[in-house]
């Protein structure tokens, strides 16, 4: 038995200079797991609660000492002596101790940090890599694939201080034969984009996720510049590389309309979907995330109707990694893909349940970071362990992003042909 003998919580810093929660789970025999909770900027209103202290005299109210206290007190007391390999039991105990719908007593950040740390401790106890242990928990032992990365090379919206409304413009190296090759392609395009921006006298400062954040005349201009950068790097758009957008449309949804203030345009729900469809006809965009507000279900139905057979439509704020909300989407034919973020739901067990539900319904799965990240690379192992097929973890810049890519390189090296890179086949509507 992987008996838990101690749990330690602490306050650490995330990639935006804000506090976040880290936890250690210690087992008999000297085994230990450590994990940190990430934090989002554009957040869905139905996400599990990230517990902050609210003390304006300390970290502008963003301290997490209450969450840390919950780890060192209530959570530690509840889990002492339990078996770390019994992940579902541990997570359920924490959920029961919390006793609220959205984890606002203990904090999803506290529960998640302990949940992931316990999984890492259990993997250490079993003497296996984390991805192997997660695959066991998922009921898919030995079944792996390497994810196609969504690389956020140009930032707007809440992730950058510029006038670009769409939050993320991403490249997916679908023509690569391996993850290692995909990473190289993305890095070359990233550096190519920097030189293109410089040649136009545009800013090469970066946003929260490491993508460039220039002021541009329109959102379409961002796509045009990326096209130039892809070709300058020696690749063909549409075959070697496809494009992906994260609109984060909830951030510019006002009074029932979509306000692209950066270019002075206002759209109805159907009008904005038509606008996005027109972009897919001009550029090889294979995936669009949060193309409408999280509450605009009628708009989502229209968007899915006009694009869902050819374009991957990813629900992030729409589904918030929540099986109850995802089931409603599946039942109503809304979107065709889900973005998976640990901290939206708050435990590993609930995360795996959302992945299984999506896959069983024929939805694709994209494992994702948050804009406020740490060096914790657990999402890399999760993507491989569940054969998710896609991962979204930022640009080829900033070590909080690159840490995940580097972990994927290590995993691919270990697994070799046991973890194929399937390219375009992983993206809904593109196979």
From Swiss-Prot:
Pathway: Carbohydrate degradation; glycolysis; pyruvate from D-glyceraldehyde 3-phosphate: step 4/5. One of its GO terms (biological process) is glycolytic process. Pfam families: Enolase_C, Enolase_N. InterPro entries: Enolase, Enolase-like_C_sf, Enolase-like_N, Enolase_C, Enolase_CS, Enolase_N. It is an enzyme of class 4 (lyase). Its main location: cytoplasm. Mg(2+) binds at residues 246, 289, 316. Catalyzes the reversible conversion of 2-phosphoglycerate (2-PG) into phosphoenolpyruvate (PEP). It is essential for the degradation of carbohydrates via glycolysis. This is Enolase.
